[in-house]
């Protein structure tokens, strides 16, 4: 299992990466916009900090997500993992990007069944929403156990 820090706060990232316990960063356009910075500037700063695996979320319909994912993958190379939502379009994008040898992280995972669909679509990673699972009276850590058995 790998642990990813979900933030766009580069000071926080730098602090936690010094522990050698964090394997990568996930972020999304909303987090980056809240920081008032350009997403690609943030991605480049993270790469310059030595972070090897950055999940870069794409949004929109199938075509928009696929084209943006391909563009980011080409621009940032091995450091880029494209993050897509676990929606019908997101899973289709995952499958197509995976066929293009692009690493994909499927987010908005609330069940083991969704993790199976993401794996079938070629996802390298899945991002379960443990906090929201716990908020809905389920046990989030059980979801992690189920997903780790699958992967």
Residue positions per predicted region:
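Conserved dinucleotide-binding and phosphotransfer motif residues
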Residues: 100
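Active-site beta->alpha loop and helix N-cap motifs at the rims of alpha/beta catalytic domains
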Residues: 3-5, 9-14, 19-21, 27-96, ...
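Catalytic alpha/beta core domains of metabolic enzymes, predominantly
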Residues: 88-94, 105, 110-151
